[in-house]
Amino acid sequence: MEYFPAALEKLVEQFARLPGIGGKSAQRLAFHVLSLTDAEAQEFADAIVEAKKKVTCCPICRNLTDGGLCPICASPKRDERVICVVADARDVAALERSREYTGRYHVLHGVISPMNHVGPDDLEIKSLVERVAAGCIDEVIMATNPDTEGEATAMYLARLLRPFGVKVTRLAYGIPVGGHLEFADDATLMRALEGRREI
């Protein structure tokens, strides 16, 4: 891209590093940023820096929060006896959109993936086991994606949690195999939650 100024090239390269953003999309985003007023551009930059500095993990469920407990763990209206295990925080947002689930969550921050060198020790599994071992959990719903890594993670966790006498269920397959929760529509997620099964 020798025809662009160096600062613009750098901006395009940074946008292209984001997942799902190719070269042309990165260029469009970079040119849009250049069309912003100085105040708008500064507000955009500040929002990125602030999110990076302030967003942390909830000490209970490992969901994203801007300090202390996440709103779901802090809510007395949520059923604390049921935990829905998801791969990442985007899956929490997808399930919350269904308005069907009233329990709490546990965010693993990934799935077991030997091909990507991600093992159980790289995930938030120890904190999940500690929550279940505390003895006040009745059911753990495995809501990892229905792909190879998601299935492997769900089966691994089911074997790990079974000795605690907790009911371990899996979302029903209203979600297509190889699909991702964040792209599922609300009705599909509702059916998947209603049709979960024990594993």
Task: Describe the predicted segments one by one.
Residues 3, 36, 40, 116-120, ...:
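Catalytic cores of large soluble enzymes that bind and process phosphate-bearing ligands
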Residues 26, 75-144:
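Extended interfacial segments that mediate partner engagement and assembly in macromolecular machines
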Residues 2-8, 17, 30-92:
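Cys/His-rich Zn2+-binding cysteine-cluster or related metal-binding knuckle/ribbon modules and their
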Residues 9-16, 27, 33-36, 63-64, ...:
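S-adenosyl-L-methionine-dependent methyltransferase catalytic core, i.e., the SAM/SAH-binding region
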Residues 129-141, 145-199:
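Long C-terminal interaction/binding lobes of large macromolecular proteins
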Residues 16, 34, 49, 66, ...:
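Signal for well-folded cores of large energy- and translation-related assemblies
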